Amino acid sequence: MTLFSYLVSVAENENFSEPERLGQLAGRLLPKLSQQQRWSLGWLGHYGVGMLFALVYVHLWRSGKLKHDLLTRIWLGGVSGIIAVAVWKATFKAHPRPPALSYDKYYIQLVPAHMVFALFAGLGYQMLNRNHHCILNKSEYAKINR
């Protein structure tokens, strides 16, 4: 997903990197942060949200609420992208010093970026699921989620 955003950034000649935007927003709220701290916060936030999305996907697949197929992964990514657009819009609106940015282009690229993320999250899930000792099977998962 992040690579997708970087590629769109190059094509549009504008920075759409989510971790860099998060770091920029943090730095504008806390100007005493060093560049390294801003960078770290941006990446930590970006990966943290990515982990939350991935955990939701795994829950939906493990519980049997959604199929684990290509179409479902694309759909999950699209829904995740729409959620991301809403969260980013709210974040930029609430921030006292939002960045100068082509917001429409930024929001539009978030949807396919999240589709890419969901496709690769599904691929990772599929690869890990082949090793039964790595991930709980459905009956074990159901027991701990009662």
What function would you assign to each model-found segment?
Residues 1-146:
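Short amphipathic, positively biased membrane-proximal segments
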